[in-house]
Amino acid sequence: MDRMQSSATYRRSFKLSVLCAGIAFFTTSSLAAGSDLMQSASQITATGLAKQQDLPSLTGESAEPALARVPDSLTINQAVQRAIQWHPDIAEAVGKLLEQADQVDVAKAKYYPQISGGMNNGYSNSYSEKGYSPSFVLSVSQMLYDFGKVSSSVRSAEAGVAQQQANVLVSIDTVAHDTAAALVQVQGYQQLVKIAQEQLSALMKIGDLARQRNNEGAASLSDATQTDARIEGARTVLTQYQANLDRWRATLATYLGWPLVKKVSDDFPASLARSCDAAKSDDRTIPAVLAAWAQANEAQAKLDNANAQMLPTISLEPQVTHYLNNHYASSETLDRTQYSAWVKVEMPLYQGGGMTASRNAAANALTAANAAVNSARLKARQQLNESQSQSQSLALSLAIQARQQRLGEKTQELYQDQYLQLGTRPLLDVLNLSLIHI
């Protein structure tokens, strides 16, 4: 009984260690973070967010190659590495990151000349001979100054890249945690099955002894009957544990992309054993917080862009037109190929209130993004505090269970001696002490 309780407590503590490790899982990542990341919640401002764009790095310590085949004994590190390098959720997140990275090039392209060509076909009363004169047109538009329209679009796209990078880390973190948690469940049920088998074997020995004593007239038939009932109960518990073990093995195999998982090693990395001992959470190592910061930077860039849209855009507009016949205006004095270039200043005067509404929407989105940053930081700290409290409680419980186990083993030996040699202890006491409690 005490071994079972100790094993169950150990399994819960084991699982909690993985949860705590998830909070600090990417401590070794190279994260280029500025000082404004360490601002308190009350100091988060739109201006501060716009000053620097911090991109979380996806490069870190090199991991061991992922296993291509199912090993005979799977460790937690091997399982996590295999899941990270195989899982489709991570591949999906990386694909979205590459897509967003291309959006940065799309935004930067507006800094360069925009060249277009085409053909005009139409009638005009300024043309002779029925007013028809088709022409080829080549035009170039080069933005000279736009009050931050393009630059804010670039910052918005770069913030989107930062957010997708953080989302990749979130996906990796989630897959790693879920895989490790499933493996810990397998470890726990492997131990429970082993203990249940030992318990069943011990009860069967007691049953053989009870039947022998009954045959010799030293004990009643009820002792053997009670033992048989306990044996069947132990078989039921063993069957339940084995079913749960098979279920968690199947779950783990799904995370790893394998048809099955054989034996799981009971070893646990020492580096994760004290993961909950961090004094405080570091925002630069928490993917969810990084994603919230990037979202706030993107919202700030969109607000700047909305304001810039209400200001003029100055551009250089050269154009070449080549007419295909002589019916164009002033064809007697002008060559078929005509050139023009002008500096264009354009700004919206009235758009039905749409631009003002867009600016207000961007401002509200920025307010929501700032709140999301605070929420992500608060949630991370809350999870760490809860995990630390549970870790301390389970560590104390493990120590108590270890003492109970030692006392229980001594008591069991004493009860067996009193039953077998002195006859002063009833068999029911021996059975109760050997009973498995779930």
Model-inferred region functions:
Residues 2-31:
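Gram-negative bacterial Sec-dependent N-terminal signal peptides
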Residues 2-7, 40-43, 171-287, 387-390, ...:
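Periplasmic alpha-helical coiled-coil/stalk elements that build and connect Gram-negative outer-membrane
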Residues 32-116, 218, 256-300, 311, ...:
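Bacterial Sec-pathway N-terminal export signals of envelope proteins
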Residues 91, 114-131, 144-170, 290, ...:
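Small/polar (Gly/Ser/Thr/Ala-rich) solvent-exposed segments
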Residues 92-107, 171, 175-195, 205-207, ...:
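Amphipathic alpha-helical coiled-coil segments
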Residues 133-135, 181, 226, 293, ...:
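Transmembrane beta-barrel architecture of outer-membrane proteins
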Residues 138-140, 343:
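Membrane-embedded beta-strands of outer-membrane beta-barrel proteins
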